[in-house]
């Protein structure tokens, strides 16, 4: 009988430990699930906003038009009024980057690639619109514009894929 009582006690103890672990882990696991879901939603909305603004401003058309003009006129200025005051700070970016650890590794990697491509385009666009490339040769201007147009298309395609993957 002692063996039966010991086995029963061991089983009862094991059930108690499992029950205790389940009740303490369940809220943590649920919170982690909610955090991951929120990170995907925040990131998806952020990327969607960038895509919407890029498509609204139709930067591809802007690049193509400027390429056509520069092919005809080497001295074409690439300056835009108001560009000097454009704010390059993105107050949402740190929030999105803080969520990286909650995303799948491949999604986090592609997100960083997308953000870096977008940053590079913004920097070059601002430099162009400030007239910082005006002293470059036609070939140099065309190289920058054509490279940026290719990066723009790649970034927009990657962004659209990320939005789907983040659902």
Q: What is each residue range found by the language model?
A:
Residues 44-167:
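Interfacial alpha-helical end/capping and short helix-turn segments at domain and membrane boundaries
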Residues 29-48:
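Juxtamembrane membrane-water interface segments immediately C-terminal to a transmembrane helix
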Residues 1-33:
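Membrane-embedded hydrophobic alpha-helical segments
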């Amino acid at each position: 009988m002692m063996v039966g009582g010991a086995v029963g006690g061991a089983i009862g103890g094991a059930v108690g430990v499992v029950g205790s672990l389940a009740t303490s882990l369940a809220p943590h696991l649920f919170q982690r699930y909610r955090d991951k879901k929120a990170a995907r939603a925040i990131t998806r909305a952020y990327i969607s906003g960038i895509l919407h603004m890029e498509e609204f401003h139709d930067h591809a058309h802007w690049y193509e038009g400027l390429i056509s003009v520069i092919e005809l006129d080497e001295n074409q200025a690439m300056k835009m009024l108001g560009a000097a005051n454009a704010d390059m700070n993105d107050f949402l970016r740190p929030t999105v980057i803080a969520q990286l650890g909650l995303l799948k590794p491949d999604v986090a990697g592609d997100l960083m690639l997308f953000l870096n491509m977008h940053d590079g385009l913004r920097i070059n666009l601002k430099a162009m619109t400030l007239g910082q490339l005006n002293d470059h040769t036609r070939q140099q201007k065309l190289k920058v514009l054509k490279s940026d147009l290719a990066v723009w298309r790649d970034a927009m395609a990657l962004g659209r894929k990320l939005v789907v993957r983040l659902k």
